[in-house]
Amino acid sequence: PYIAGWLSIPGDTRYTEYVVEFIADLRPDGTYCCLGNWQMDYSYLERQYTSVRTEYSGVSGYAGFQSLGDGTRVSIMSFWDVYCTDADGSVTTIRAQRVYPEATDRTEDFSGEGTGAHCIVPYNWKAGYWYQMHLKCGVSQSTGNTIVEQWVYDYATGESTLLCAYDLGVPNVCFKGASAFFLENFLEPLSGEVRTMEV
């Protein structure tokens, strides 16, 4: 159960950075403030394969902030696997690889809503305070592939923090088209709690 909205960005618009400011005055446990649910431009792969897709048509990844059931507050960034089919019908699966942080105890592959990789990092975001999430694409110095970094800026302290970064396994990738954001309750026992989010 969640409430969602879309940033109306034309489908052919490509961009390398994505910034959202948000505040959650009420964020009980079981709250997910998803600030980006986006599509990546994989035209580099589309020139090499007959078919390129992710588990959900038009959605490549998502990121935001959660308040877990035990009260722990975290950031999350996820990328779905990319399935590339060649002319012979052979399928190559490309999974993003985390390059920062070097290790966390909550970094893992995911399944259930498709398959892919996500990084969950402790970040003590507080109710009633403004934050900015900043996603940006760059180029890996070691692989030449596109890197996507997730940053957070705390307006109260003036501090910017790099939360995580992924090597997408493919060069020349950027964001494309509209992006969704949503406020979700992901724990049924807490579904009656009031939650808010402004973006």
Predicted regions span which residues?
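Secretory/extracellular carbohydrate-interaction modules
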Residues: 1-105, 120
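Flexible glycan-contacting loops in extracellular carbohydrate-active proteins
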Residues: 163, 167-193
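Short, intrinsically disordered, charge-balanced linker/junction segments flanking boundaries
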Residues: 197-199
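Short acidic (Asp/Glu) patches
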Residues: 109-120
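Carbohydrate-binding surfaces in secreted/extracellular proteins
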Residues: 125-162
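Short loop/turn segments at secondary-structure transitions that flank enzyme active sites
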Residues: 26, 81-85, 139, 156, ...
